[in-house]
């Protein structure tokens, strides 16, 4: 599933405008398993949107590094990462309820207690609920590239959004992006390189090899079989 959980239009103060969104709410049909997960596991792992800042130690019951993933699709890679790194905490945001249900079901099956999920617009969550300087990592994997030129403004990686992400990262925190659309990778690189306070972690100052910490998704595997490339970008907050 494409990741498309952002409304990237901002006013002069960096606040999200509501006119244009980069996602359409395509809720789709819930399977019985997804419906069961939403009914039974959301009360434990789900986080309702509010205008109060989250207290991560209270939310997870401990002090630990927090990774935020924006647009986790069906949640397979997010659950895999949370399982592989029990010493870290993970918060995922996804607007499509079938994906949220699938993620909850998988997390419950794995017995995870270091994963929480939200079903809301990610920009609003970042503005209203994520404290500044609180995140170890922000992950944005395979966002909708909006191929047509007239739709490029819908791309979520724009300067105001990247600045917003930077404000939520701790010093030394990392914004990790991945895309299978080379023009979007070039756009991401241009945007991120223009912002003071980010350092590109690529030795060649462009893209990084896929880190072992990012699982290969089914979507990505299919792309590899078709000969499609994937570009990973990792930028560290340095000030």
Swiss-Prot record:
- Keyword set for this entry? Methyltransferase, S-adenosyl-L-methionine, Transferase, tRNA processing
Q: Where is this region: Interaction with RNA?
A: 150-155
Is-annotated flag, keyword Repressor? no
What does the record give as the active site? 144
What residues bind S-adenosyl-L-methionine, as annotated? 69, 94, 121, 144
Quickly give the catalysed reaction. Answer: guanosine(46) in tRNA + S-adenosyl-L-methionine = N(7)-methylguanosine(46) in tRNA + S-adenosyl-L-homocysteine
InterPro entries referenced in this protein's UniProt entry, alphabetically: SAM-dependent_MTases_sf (IPR029063), tRNA_(Gua-N-7)_MeTrfase_Trmb (IPR003358), tRNA_methyltr_TrmB_bact (IPR055361)
Please list every transmembrane segment annotated in the UniProt record, as residue ranges.
Answer: none
Cellular component annotations (GO), alphabetically ordered = tRNA methyltransferase complex
Q: Spell out the family assignment given in the record's similarity comment.
A: Belongs to the class I-like SAM-binding methyltransferase superfamily. TrmB family.
Q: How does it assemble?
A: Monomer.
User: PANTHER family in the record, alphabetically?
Assistant: 3-DEOXY-D-MANNO-OCTULOSONIC-ACID TRANSFERASE/TRNA GUANINE-N 7 - -METHYLTRANSFERASE (PTHR23417), PENTACOTRIPEPTIDE-REPEAT REGION OF PRORP DOMAIN-CONTAINING PROTEIN (PTHR23417:SF14)
Which protein are we looking at?
tRNA (guanine-N(7)-)-methyltransferase
Native organism is Shigella boydii serotype 4 (strain Sb227)
Q: What is the lineage of its organism?
A: Bacteria, Pseudomonadati, Pseudomonadota, Gammaproteobacteria, Enterobacterales
């Amino acid at each position: 599933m494409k990741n498309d959980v952002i409304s990237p239009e901002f006013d002069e103060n960096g606040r999200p405008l509501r006119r244009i969104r980069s996602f359409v709410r395509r809720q789709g049909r819930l399977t019985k398993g997804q419906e069961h997960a939403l009914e039974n596991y959301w009360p434990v792992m789900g986080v309702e949107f509010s205008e109060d800042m989250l207290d991560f130690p209270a939310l997870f019951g401990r002090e630990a590094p927090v990774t935020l993933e924006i647009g986790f699709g069906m949640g397979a890679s997010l659950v895999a990462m949370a399982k592989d790194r029990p010493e870290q905490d993970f918060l995922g945001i996804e607007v499509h309820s079938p994906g949220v249900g699938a993620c909850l079901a998988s997390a419950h099956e794995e017995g995870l207690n270091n994963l929480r999920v939200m079903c809301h617009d990610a920009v609003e969550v970042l503005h209203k609920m994520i404290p500044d300087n609180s995140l170890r990592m922000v992950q944005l994997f395979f966002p909708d590239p909006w191929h047509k030129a007239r739709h490029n403004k819908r791309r979520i990686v724009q300067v105001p959004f990247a600045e917003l992400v930077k404000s939520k990262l701790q010093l030394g925190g990392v914004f990790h992006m991945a895309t299978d659309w080379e023009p979007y990778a070039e756009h991401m690189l241009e945007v991120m390189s223009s912002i003071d306070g980010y350092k590109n972690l690529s030795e060649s100052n462009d893209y990084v090899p896929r880190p072992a910490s990012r699982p290969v998704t089914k979507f990505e595997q299919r792309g590899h079989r078709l000969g499609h490339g994937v570009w990973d970008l990792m930028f560290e907050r340095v000030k």
